[in-house]
């Protein structure tokens, strides 16, 4: 396949650094360091992180998904039925910090090797590790902290950059301090990475780092910085947008021309099977044990339906409502089954579909939004429309954006259409201060833990720290998020 194979989580725990004292000598060479990084990336494919829940969380809470019936599983994302003792989804916290602490131990071990006179060049390994740590902190602060541009002095998550001792009890940093650490890691990481696309697909390389910088700076409303980073990737020519006619088929391919950072899923190790993202988004009952627990909301379908010739209909198909009512409703998403015919992406099982974390399409959309607000000479509404129209070509029935017509809402709508199922919508709506409306009336499902609409003043837009985590680290007891 031209890509590395992730080691399993079990193997990783058996042979790689942990936070116990006996991990000190586990890394001696660059090859050892790369095996550790492989293990960290394998851990990312867990159902509690990128393997499923993070993407489900972003779209369910953002109003682009709805549910057909209550009580099937993961519907607490949609209903906001979270407390510190139930439906905490603490796997986000534990998996995120597991990955962070493995990276910290790796960086500490490398530092000791370098200080002892090792002649190995660990630059790439350190650059990858720092880039990944920045991603992990970015995810955690979005889940547990308020938007940067809303209240950056509120609690974020603990900034831990060294291996922890047994008795350590780190406290929460502010959102601003988290973002400062994220930017520092990205800056330090970029300086260590070769300015090229990695030969082995799937690793966090230089362009992964720059893409993350673009995403993070957009969240911070550093529009000049976001535009600089996005333009560097676009103008490098390393990646190429799919032609509209090729967009649907791209989901049945691995490491395509748009893929900047993509997690490889293997049939032997990280295939979640009936617990996979694909099974949760496809039509209920289409295959044995197919979940179909989430469907596209009417609001998303109306948005995509602005152009019935939009190529992105190609990964949508009839959902459970169609089964029950014989009325066409293309609310089932097949991005993570490869195609509506369940083609997969070239592996032995059709649920072992790679997770595309950052695509070039997103970078164009970042460039459009940043250019619309940037003060840079090469920015402005004309430039913003140009970037947006490269993605809007996938909706041939819609008029191109112009300097006179382009708005934040137009870009936000395009982000919804393009990034559906990729976990971005909720965070976009929160950072932009928008009101989210939920499609509760679709099946008249009663929801008591939120209203039909929410905005970022609603306390439960952030998750609780689970009581188990507080019991393990009493220093967090007085730092619980409001409302829990």
Regions found by a protein language model. Name each.
Residues 179, 223, 377-381:
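TPR-repeat structural position
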């Amino acid at each position: 396949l031209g890509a590395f194979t992730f080691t399993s989580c079990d193997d990783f725990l058996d042979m790689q650094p942990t936070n116990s004292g006996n991990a000190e000598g586990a890394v001696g060479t660059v090859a050892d360091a790369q095996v550790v990084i492989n293990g960290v990336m394998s851990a990312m494919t867990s159902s509690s992180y990128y393997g499923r829940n993070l993407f489900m969380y972003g779209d369910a809470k953002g109003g682009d998904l709805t549910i057909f019936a209550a009580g099937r599983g993961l519907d607490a994302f949609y209903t906001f039925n979270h407390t510190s003792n139930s439906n905490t989804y603490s796997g986000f916290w534990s998996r995120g910090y597991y990955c962070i602490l493995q990276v910290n131990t790796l960086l500490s071990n490398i530092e000791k090797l370098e200080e002892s006179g090792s002649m190995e060049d660990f630059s790439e390994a350190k650059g990858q590790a720092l880039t990944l740590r920045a991603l992990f902190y970015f995810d955690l602060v979005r889940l547990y902290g308020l938007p940067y541009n809303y209240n950056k002095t509120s609690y974020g998550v603990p900034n831990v950059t060294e291996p922890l001792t047994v008795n350590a009890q780190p406290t929460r940093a502010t959102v601003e301090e988290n973002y400062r650490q994220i930017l520092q890691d990205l800056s330090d990481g970029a300086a260590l990475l070769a300015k090229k696309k990695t030969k082995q697909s799937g690793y966090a390389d230089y362009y992964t780092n720059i893409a993350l910088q673009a995403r993070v700076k957009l969240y911070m409303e550093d529009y000049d910085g976001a535009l600089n980073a996005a333009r560097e990737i676009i103008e490098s020519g390393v990646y190429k947008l799919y032609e509209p006619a090729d967009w649907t088929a791209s989901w049945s391919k691995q490491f395509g021309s748009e893929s900047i950072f993509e997690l490889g899923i293997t049939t032997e190790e990280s295939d979640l099977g009936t617990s996979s993202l694909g099974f949760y988004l496809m039509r209920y009952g289409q295959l044995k044990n197919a979940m179909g627990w989430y469907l596209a909301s009417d609001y998303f379908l109306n948005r995509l339906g602005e152009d019935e010739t939009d190529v992105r209909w190609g990964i949508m198909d009839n959902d459970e409502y169609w089964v029950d009512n014989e009325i066409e409703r293309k609310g089932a998403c097949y991005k993570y089954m490869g195609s509506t015919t369940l083609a997969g992406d070239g592996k032995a099982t059709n649920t072992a579909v790679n997770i595309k974390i950052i695509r070039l399409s997103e970078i164009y959309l970042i460039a459009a939004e940043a250019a619309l607000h940037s003060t840079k000479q090469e920015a402005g509404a004309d430039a913003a429309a140009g970037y947006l129209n490269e993605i809007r070509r996938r909706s041939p029935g819609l008029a191109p954006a112009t300097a006179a017509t382009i708005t934040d809402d137009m870009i936000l709508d395009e982000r919804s259409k393009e990034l559906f199922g990729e976990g971005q919508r909720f965070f976009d709506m929160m950072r932009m201060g928008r009101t989210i409306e939920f499609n509760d009336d679709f099946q008249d499902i009663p929801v008591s833990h939120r209203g039909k609409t929410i905005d970022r003043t609603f306390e439960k837009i952030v998750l609780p720290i689970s009581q188990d985590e507080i019991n393990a680290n009493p220093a967090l007891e007085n730092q619980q998020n409001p409302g829990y």
